[in-house]
Every structure is written in structure tokens, then in C-alpha cells.
């Protein structure tokens, strides 16, 4: 579980030792395999095309030196120092390889608890976040829209979701989908929780959306880029209109692999939404947008307090291409579901802002029929302007249609 007295938001970026290889859009499966097999030490190459959509999981990495995610056009390779030199040489001369980058450890983006604000309060009927985003006055519920939440899993025994159809898959080796952390259950609750919980106020946005849970972070709250890429491939293959990722690494330079994946997801009709990061220590240190949110093709979300000012931890935009904040949403003192027996919990972070936006995106997808880039633009067009710098909130506060 998360200890609210201990920050879990800002960690030096750690590398796993593996490499992410981004291929050109028009490269064939055969060209990708040939490029990888030309690398010294890469003898076996697995492909997501070799398994069913339901079977894509952590075991795909266990028997091969490299794995290709065909829909994403990305490979993950486990290479040593000698093979790395060979891989770099292959990338220099092979036109189907766009980039070779280190794989990073990613973490759930939750921060410390803060004193309650007074502008908007959780009421008897709904949370302050749903009030601020006008969800409570919206008649839509996201019915017919598939929303994928890639996080620490979900408490499948939670009584607020009894009878709800939930499609789930773990991408963490040795762990099932059941959430032993809490972060994922909280994010699923905010994005897709019930309209009328039996015992407490409403906390979920798209109460009628179809829930897809991809466990990409362990019960300790950490994972790898490979876990995320595998789950993104799974979500896109399952026709999810929205992917919500309340996770990241403090990497200021955009990762080419995520830029390509976000762009290819939009083309496939999937909007990817990610937490901007919690590395700010305002007012002195505004922080920066981390990966994967700092890709221009992934919607980056900043966090607001109940007085609709910036949450003190929420990262600010940076001058690098892709380092902008696109939109903002409630992220401080957010009440939502939590694994039993606790049932509910209040935590803070850009992680909590992100599922608000994901749920609202599902409402726009339902009301407009738009997908991909068109859905992105509809979501931005529906924002409420704020008297805050664009570097902090982008277009403004996400609001329901």
C-alpha cells in the first residue's frame, strides 16, 4: 500500500539494461526480424503476431533475445555490451531502424498527502473532482467505449464493481491482476467507477464504460517500458478508444519509441493519456514533464487543487519538443476506490488527474463518435479556461460534454 507520509513521485531515472528499437512505419515483419537477427547475440526473435491478443503477456519476453510488438512497430532487446555495439552499428546502416534507446524503469506517480483545500469539497453525492469537471451534470456515462487503465492492476473483489464486466491481463511476471498496491484500483475507480456506489459519494466519471485493466506495474509500484508497450499493444488490439497511464519516469528527453507508439495509436483510433509527473516542488522548482507524457502524440495531464490552482507537485512544461502540458484535471486530495478491506482512499498526484481526463474522453467518444486525433481535439475544445500559465495547465480544465 502507499504510505501517504512517504513521497513516491520523484526517483532518478533507472535503466533496465534492455534496449527499445523503433522501426519505420512501413517496415515489414520480415525486415524487422532481419534487422534484429543481424545483431550479434540476438539469436531468437519473438513477435506479438505469433500469439493471440489474449496471450500477449510477460512470458513473451522469457524465451527470446528480442521481442517485436507488431502493431506498435517497436522491439525490446536484451543485449549485453558486445551486442549493444553491434545493435548501434546495425541502426547506423539499416534504414528500417529509426532509433535505439535505453529501456527505463517506470513508477506509479503518486505523491504525499496535502492539507485539504476549501474551494470545492467532496459532497454527499459526488467528489470535488466530478463537480469541478461538470461530470455530475452530464447525462453521458461512456457506454460502448472501451477504456484501458495500465497501472498496478485492480481489486477484482471490490464490491462497488460487482457484476461489472472487466477484461484484465497482467504484464508483470509472477503477478496476477489483483492489485496489491492500490494505485491501479484508485485510477480505475476515478475513470470508470459506478454512478451510485452503495455506501459513499460518487467518485467515477464514465460509469458505463467497458473496463480493460492492464497490470504493468508490480505490487511494489514499479515496472518497465516493455511491460507498458506490451499492454498498449493489447489495448489497441482490443479496440480501446482510450488508454490511461498514471505512470512515468523522470526522463526529460522524449523517448522516440513512445512518440511513435502514440502516433500509431492515434492512427488506430486510440487516444493515449499520461500523467505529466510529480517532480515539481513549487514555488521554487517547477519540475519537468517526464516520459511517456513528454511525447507530442500522448496527451499530458497536469494536476489541479480544489481551489483550481496548480497542485504544488505538478510538473510544468519545458522547452523541449513534446515537453508541454496539454490539459489539467483534479489531482489533489482525490477520493476513489481502494483494495479491500480499506475500500476507499484519498491520495494525490498527476496520476489522479489522468483518470479524470480518461473518463471524460470516454464521454466525448460516446457523444461524438470521434476517435484518435479527432477525440483529442474534441477533448481540448471542451476545456474550461483557467487564469493560470499555459505551461502549467495547457488548454485548461478538462470538462464533460
Model-derived segments and spans:
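Autoinhibitory propeptides
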Residues: 4-14, 43-124
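N-terminal domain-start motif of subtilase-like serine proteases
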Residues: 2-12, 79-92, 112-149, 169-179, ...
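Extracellular S/T/G-rich loop segment that most often corresponds to the catalytic His/Ser-adjacent loop
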Residues: 151-153, 290-366, 370, 376-381, ...
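C-terminal subdomain of the subtilisin-like protease fold in secreted/lumenal serine endopeptidases
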Residues: 203-206, 232, 236-248, 255, ...
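Short glycine-/aliphatic-rich beta-strand segments at the starts of folded cytosolic domains
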Residues: 14-24
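Solvent-exposed loop/turn segments at secondary-structure junctions
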Residues: 104-108, 153-156, 171-172, 196-197, ...
Amino acid at each position: 500500500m502507499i504510505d501517504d507520509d512517504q513521497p513516491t513521485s520523484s526517483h532518478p531515472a533507472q535503466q533496465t539494461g534492455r534496449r527499445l528499437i523503433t522501426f519505420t512505419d512501413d517496415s515489414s515483419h520480415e525486415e524487422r526480424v532481419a534487422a534484429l537477427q543481424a545483431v550479434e547475440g540476438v539469436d531468437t526473435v519473438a513477435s506479438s503476431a505469433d500469439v493471440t491478443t489474449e496471450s500477449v503477456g510477460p512470458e513473451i519476453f522469457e524465451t527470446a533475445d528480442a521481442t517485436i510488438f507488431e502493431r506498435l512497430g517497436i522491439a525490446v532487446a536484451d543485449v549485453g555490451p558486445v551486442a549493444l555495439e553491434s545493435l548501434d552499428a546495425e541502426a547506423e546502416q539499416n534504414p528500417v531502424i529509426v532509433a535505439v534507446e535505453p529501456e527505463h524503469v517506470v513508477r506509479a506517480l503518486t505523491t504525499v498527502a496535502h492539507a485539504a483545500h476549501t474551494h470545492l469539497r467532496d459532497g454527499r453525492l459526488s467528489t470535488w473532482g466530478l463537480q469541478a469537471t461538470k461530470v455530475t451534470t452530464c447525462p453521458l456515462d461512456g457506454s460502448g467505449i472501451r477504456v484501458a487503465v495500465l497501472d498496478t492492476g485492480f481489486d477484482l473483489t471490490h464490491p462497488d464493481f460487482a457484476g461489472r464486466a472487466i477484461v484484465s491481463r497482467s504484464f508483470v511476471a509472477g503477478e496476477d491482476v489483483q492489485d496489491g498496491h492500490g494505485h491501479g484500483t484508485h485510477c480505475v475507480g476515478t475513470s470508470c467507477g459506478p454512478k451510485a456506489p452503495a455506501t459513499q459519494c460518487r467518485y467515477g466519471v464514465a460509469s458505463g464504460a467497458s473496463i480493460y485493466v492492464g497490470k504493468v506495474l508490480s505490487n511494489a509500484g514499479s515496472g518497465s517500458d516493455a511491460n507498458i508497450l506490451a499492454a498498449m499493444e493489447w489495448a489497441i488490439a482490443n479496440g480501446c478508444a482510450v488508454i490511461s497511464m498514471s505512470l512515468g519516469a523522470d526522463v526529460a528527453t522524449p523517448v522516440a519509441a513512445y512518440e511513435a507508439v502514440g502516433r500509431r495509436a492515434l492512427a488506430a483510433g486510440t487516444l493515449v493519456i499520461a500523467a505529466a509527473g510529480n517532480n515539481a516542488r513549487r514555488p521554487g522548482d517547477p519540475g519537468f514533464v517526464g516520459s511517456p507524457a513528454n511525447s507530442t502524440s500522448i496527451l499530458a495531464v497536469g494536476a489541479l487543487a480544489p481551489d483550481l490552482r496548480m497542485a504544488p507537485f505538478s510538473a510544468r512544461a519545458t522547452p523541449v519538443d513534446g515537453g508541454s502540458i496539454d490539459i489539467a484535471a483534479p489531482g489533489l486530495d482525490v477520493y476513489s476506490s481502494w483494495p479491500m478491506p480499506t475500500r476507499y482512499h484519498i491520495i494525490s498526484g498527476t496520476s489522479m488527474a489522468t483518470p479524470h481526463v480518461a473518463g471524460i474522453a470516454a464521454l466525448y467518444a460516446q457523444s461524438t463518435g470521434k476517435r484518435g486525433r479527432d477525440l483529442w481535439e474534441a477533448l481540448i475544445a471542451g476545456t474550461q479556461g483557467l487564469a493560470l500559465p499555459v505551461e502549467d495547465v495547457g488548454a485548461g480544465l478538462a470538462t464533460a460534454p
